[in-house]
């Protein structure tokens, strides 16, 4: 039998064997049998050199067409096998959706996190970016570079949690402002939310609480800009009709400094136990960045001005949701937490 007849017979055998492929093992065996280094089709192609030029061309074309036919048939079988495997996996892993699902109690967003998220979004809408920093901080960043001198009462052991080697648990998020001014050039507009720590525990104070502080630095930034930003913020939090007042105050890192009050949200300014019969509630502290702070971070106070502000998140949450004891926010009592389901 000549080579051409052998190839045609080989093609018929291939058709029958391909039809009987049912798994990858058989498929690979057929691939090796015909297309391997010692495979039947490979052997035919290697023997073409012994043929005349006319026969070589005709037989070569036939051998290559059979090779292509086998490769396509094997590829189709491979896809068929993989499809069946996937169907089998899906059949075994199929879920009976008619079965009743396990009931999970709907969660409730914690009022502190809800308030923090809302405050952050308000400032982001005004062009501020959010920055963060370590909670274990250098004493220089927490105090010295913020114009808080060595013997200032805030540095006392009874007020601050010190660790070692000039490190402490930050008492405010102001160190994030220092870090931002050290790594960025003006203009700067940031807010820094996070946990802070102070040695204090009573119905209105906690040794750990959340703060958000803001900083804006640029040329010609004024106290008027500060008042405008805070007015927009407070109206978004408490409503457009909330009375707002600024009172002169003192902070080492701002000059001039002010504290901001809003009309009591409980008695609507008439006077009650919450506002100590003043009709006002203290909300935050603020002021223009002290030139000494700018000098500490390498920003020229003759070229740039800026303002800073800071407020306690728990304070805002307590006022908004009329919570009388800050310790309730940290008890993990579901009876308390689930009251706030749906407020987010």
From Swiss-Prot:
Query: What remark does the entry make about the cofactor?
Result: Binds 2 magnesium ions per tetramer.
Query: What organism is the protein native to?
Result: Sulfurihydrogenibium sp. (strain YO3AOP1)
Q: What class of enzyme is it?
A: ligase
Q: What is its main location?
A: cytoplasm
State the superkingdom.
Bacteria
Quaternary structure note: Tetramer of two alpha and two beta subunits.
Q: Catalytic activity, per the record?
A: tRNA(Phe) + L-phenylalanine + ATP = L-phenylalanyl-tRNA(Phe) + AMP + diphosphate + H(+)
Protein name per its UniProtKB record: Phenylalanine--tRNA ligase alpha subunit
The family database entries (PANTHER family) matched by this protein are listed as: PHENYLALANINE--TRNA LIGASE, MITOCHONDRIAL (PTHR11538:SF41), PHENYLALANYL-TRNA SYNTHETASE (PTHR11538)
Per its UniProt record, what PROSITE patterns does this chain match?
AA_TRNA_LIGASE_II
Keyword Signal belongs to the record? no
What family is this? Belongs to the class-II aminoacyl-tRNA synthetase family. Phe-tRNA synthetase alpha subunit type 1 subfamily.
């Amino acid at each position: 039998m000549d080579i051409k007849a052998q190839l045609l017979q080989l093609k018929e055998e291939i058709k029958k064997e391909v039809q009987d492929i049912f798994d990858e093992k058989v498929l690979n065996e057929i691939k090796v049998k015909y297309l391997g280094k010692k495979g039947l089709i490979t052997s035919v192609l290697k023997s073409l050199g012994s043929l005349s030029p006319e026969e070589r061309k005709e037989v070569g074309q036939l051998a290559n067409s059979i090779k292509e036919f086998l490769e396509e048939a094997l590829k189709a079988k491979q896809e068929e096998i993989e499809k069946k495997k996937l169907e089998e996996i899906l059949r075994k892993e199929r879920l009976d959706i008619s079965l009743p699902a396990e009931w999970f109690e709907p969660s409730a967003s914690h009022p502190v996190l809800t308030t923090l998220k809302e405050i952050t979004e308000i400032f982001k809408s005004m062009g501020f970016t959010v920055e963060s920093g370590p909670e274990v901080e250098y004493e220089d960043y927490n105090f010295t570079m913020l114009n808080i001198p060595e013997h200032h009462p805030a540095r006392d052991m009874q007020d601050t949690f010190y660790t070692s080697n000039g490190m402490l648990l930050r008492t405010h998020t102001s160190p994030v402002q220092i870090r931002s001014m050290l790594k960025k050039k003006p203009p700067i507009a940031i807010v820094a939310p996070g946990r802070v720590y102070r040695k204090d525990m009573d119905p209105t104070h906690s040794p750990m609480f959340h703060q958000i502080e803001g900083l804006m630095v640029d040329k010609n930034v004024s106290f008027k800009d500060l008042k405008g930003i805070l007015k927009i913020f407070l109206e978004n939090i408490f409503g457009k009709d909330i009375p707002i007042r600024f009172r002169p105050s003192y902070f080492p890192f701002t000059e001039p400094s002010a504290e901001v009050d809003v009309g009591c949200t409980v008695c609507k300014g008439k006077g009650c136990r919450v506002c100590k019969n003043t009709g006002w509630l203290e909300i935050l502290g603020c002021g223009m960045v002290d030139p000494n702070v700018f000098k500490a971070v390498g920003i020229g106070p003759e070229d740039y001005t800026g303002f800073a502000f800071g407020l306690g998140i728990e304070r805002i949450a307590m006022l908004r949701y009329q919570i009388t004891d800050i310790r309730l926010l940290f008890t993990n009592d579901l009876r308390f937490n689930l009251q706030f389901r749906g407020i987010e």
